[in-house]
């Protein structure tokens, strides 16, 4: 670690226990044990001039005027590492803009679930594969203490969705599912608008006792995303002791304690929910313990930060695989079609507003 002097970390770094702040917070603490670390807002207009022993690592942004994207074009970096969520779904909307900067990066530390890594070779991003390092998310169990001692009786199990209503969360399907099963309690934390068939609980601070007390009343966390990299709420639910129920398109598959639900057919989804209503308490407790073991052994910040440190110190910098004309055209179209496209008036307005706020703060 003597070859690197300073790490420029482009990531939100705050005191919140939710992502993205908690990612930046834990990374900063880990990196400062070995390097001088400077942090930046990932959506700010800024160009970093690299020192001869400096590393640029962090969150790229759809807008080309942002700090990571503009700084990555500068010569002289010891290493350039993208570190951001990755969802290689067929639409390509989440990450298509990365085509403009991936070649400048030595590696892409892709925060995503194993299900998406399994689909990468069939996606529009297949030529990125040599540069990608799979980086599973993490939670601190002290921030999300175990609270689910007992489950509701068979037939009275309750389902909780935690999240927003953006396109990738597929909440319209969740509404259909809840309406098809009016006898089952489906609730939502994360907003104040109404979702058909779900009880709206508003927004809550999960560090507060009243939020934990409310969550304790539920048995399953449900998320039916259609293009969701790997929602942190799944790991948070595991820590609390709830059993996650998620679509494969939410990033996780092959974990016995994370129950998958199909989203291609509503009847199959209804069948899955009805089956979960009759699972024994003993089986739920078994899944609960398997999930806690997963958190202790893998989905933790020591493992996460160790992977990042390894890539900072590595000299491996593979080229992209050969891309087809279909790949090129697909990603070009996806960037323009994406709801996150930087040139959309609403997105550009938010970008300017945010940077005016940063400019004002810097003058104080």
Regions found by a protein language model. Name each.
Residues 92-96, 103-130:
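A short, active-site helix/loop in glycosyltransferases that binds the activated sugar's phosphate group
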Residues 141, 152-200, 205-206:
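Conserved catalytic-core segment of nucleotide-activated headgroup transferases in glycan assembly
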Residues 242-246:
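Short hydrophobic beta-strand element within catalytic cores of glycosyltransferases
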Residues 226:
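Aromatic "clamp/platform" in nucleotide-sugar-dependent glycosyltransferases that forms part
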Residues 281-343:
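A charged, aromatic-enriched C-terminal amphipathic alpha-helix characteristic of glycosyltransferases
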Residues 92-93, 133-156:
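Acidic anion/phosphate-binding donor-loop and adjacent secondary structure
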Residues 1-62:
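N-terminal pre-catalytic "stem/leader" segment of glycosyltransferase-like enzymes
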Residues 258-267, 275-281:
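Conserved acidic donor-binding segment of nucleotide-sugar-dependent glycosyltransferases
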